[in-house]
A protein has these predicted regions:
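Soluble or luminal CAZymes and related metallo-dependent hydrolases
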Residues: 57-60, 110-114, 178-183, 207, ...
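Carbohydrate-interacting/catalytic domains
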Residues: 16-41, 45-48, 53-77, 83, ...
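Short, solvent-exposed turn/loop segments enriched in Gly/Ser/Thr/Pro and often Arg
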Residues: 77-91, 132-141, 202-208, 231-236, ...
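Hydrophobic faces of well-ordered beta-strands that scaffold small-molecule active sites
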Residues: 43-45, 76-78, 129-131, 199, ...
Length: 453
């Protein structure tokens, strides 16, 4: 859903005023996730089915699977595949996140057999499948509003409440245990009946941790290696069973660095904060764009314009403790916002960034130094206001990343003698000798070196 970051706290107050059964999540929980092994060196590619092809169907999207496999994509996350409510609908097609039926398929995309065939095709190519889930609210004409009105938070007039400007939705009440059980049953359906590999959870930050401590183990009982990604960055999510979270503060710092508003070393303060407030096993999902940022905030073409995209994309693909995300069309690249409530197909023709992403994603899949649990170490390679450098290391493998996060050419030199010697320049595909000799890195430049291969 569209992020109104400054209003998150306000939203909790509004809902609290509307009902005594607030959905405000507790901050004190105890259990942690055991990550599925397949995500540790994996990556995520977000699919906007409506806009991905002219047809906007599962069957049409299937024609892109070979291309995505070739690009190194490992996990495909589909935005909500459920039917969209018609009541209070926004635009002609409505928001993907106004769900009318938790166990139904949006007929615009196809039918259940089409979906099952697509999941099988993805699995047959060795890739994983995530679907978007919207537990915080339903669409404005979801059947539960008639059959189970007690499932919903009420406003001051006794009607099912809404949040922010999401007038096409109605907020669910997580103090209702029957609703919780119904939600878990619906989520389990997609696991047991269609074989998905996990969930990206919308507005996870407004759902209580106690629910996730109940829900996630119940789903993992059906399939033990499920992956759970929370849209949110509240620490309680990472101690309630989620594997990964949205690192919004890091993303916003990246945008400021790209705009020249903050120095490159500003990224360090966010990394230090994450290290202090999250369990060490928590996985941030780094990105330069996603469906919200593209539609509402001009990412990545506006936030990381032109050549600025590349070093920040390298950052997202190689940063410590993380899993990277690529959004539909970034490989083209997509240089416009996709409307949220109307049809506007992506045209794939140039694929100018496909080889770039392939290099990064294949490196991550094949080199355990980029595993989510590999060691991260910041190193000095130049003026730290502009040059950001670090190593990743695990199992005798080492990766060195050097980024020029500025619009000016920067001198680069290494001082750490442990980095001297032969290394493979990943993007040039050649062996080089690294030493204390300085060189110039072009504006928005980047270099990735692999040792011990």
């Amino acid at each position: 859903m569209k992020k109104w970051f400054l209003l998150i706290f306000v939203s909790a107050l509004i809902i609290s005023c509307k009902s005594k059964t607030s959905t405000t999540a507790p901050d004190t929980v105890t259990n942690t996730a055991t990550h599925p092994g397949w995500i540790m060196q994996g990556n995520i590619y977000e699919v906007n089915t409506r806009q991905y092809t002219k047809e906007g169907t599962f069957n049409a999207f299937a024609g892109h699977l070979d291309r995505l496999k070739e690009m190194g994509v490992q996990t495909i996350w589909f935005m909500p595949i459920n039917p969209i409510s018609k009541k209070d609908r926004k635009g002609s097609l409505g928001s993907y996140y106004a769900v009318a039926d938790y166990t139904g398929i949006n007929p615009e995309y196809g039918n259940l057999d089409d979906w099952k065939n697509l999941v099988k095709a993805i699995h047959d190519k060795g890739m994983k499948v995530l679907i978007d889930w919207v537990p915080n609210h339903t669409g404005a004409d979801h059947p539960w509003l008639q059959t189970h009105p007690g499932f919903f938070i009420k406003d001051s007039t006794g009607q099912a409440a809404t949040m922010f400007d999401w007038t096409d939705t109605r907020v669910l009440d997580f103090k209702n245990n029957e609703m919780q059980d119904s939600m878990i049953a619906a989520m389990k359906y997609w696991v047991t009946e269609t074989g998905i590999d996990g969930y990206r959870v919308d507005v996870a930050w407004n759902v209580p941790g106690d629910f996730w401590k109940k829900c996630i183990p119940a789903l993992k009982a059906a399939k033990s290696d499920l992956f759970f990604l929370a849209e949110g960055d509240k620490p309680y999510l990472m101690t309630s069973g989620f594997d990964a979270f949205y690192p919004w503060e890091m993303f916003h710092m990246m945008v400021k660095v790209a705009a020249g508003e903050r120095p490159a070393f500003g990224l360090d303060s966010i990394k230090a904060k994450y290290d202090s407030v999250y369990p060490k096993e928590a996985i941030p999902m780094y990105f330069t764009s996603n469906h919200d940022e593209n539609s509402w905030n001009k990412s990545d073409y506006g936030t990381f314009p032109g050549a600025a995209h590349a070093p920040f994309a390298v950052f997202t693909q190689t940063m410590g403790s993380s899993v990277p995300l690529v959004y539909s069309g970034q490989e083209e690249p997509l240089l416009r916002p996709l409307p949220f409530f109307e049809k506007d197909s992506i045209v794939f023709s140039k694929l100018e960034r496909a080889a770039f992403y392939k290099t990064l994603q294949e490196l991550r899949k094949n080199n355990e130094a980029l595993s989510a649990d590999a060691v991260f170490k910041k190193v000095k390679a130049g003026d730290e206001k502009s040059v950001y450098a670090y190593t990743r290391e695990k199992g005798g493998k080492k990766i060195l990343v050097i980024l020029n996060l500025s619009k000016k050419e920067q001198p680069v030199s290494l001082t750490d003698q442990s980095l001297f010697g032969k290394a493979n320049n990943v993007f040039k595909g050649q062996s080089e000798t690294l030493n204390a000799t300085a060189w110039k890195m072009e504006p928005w430049g980047y270099a990735v070196f692999s040792y011990n291969n």
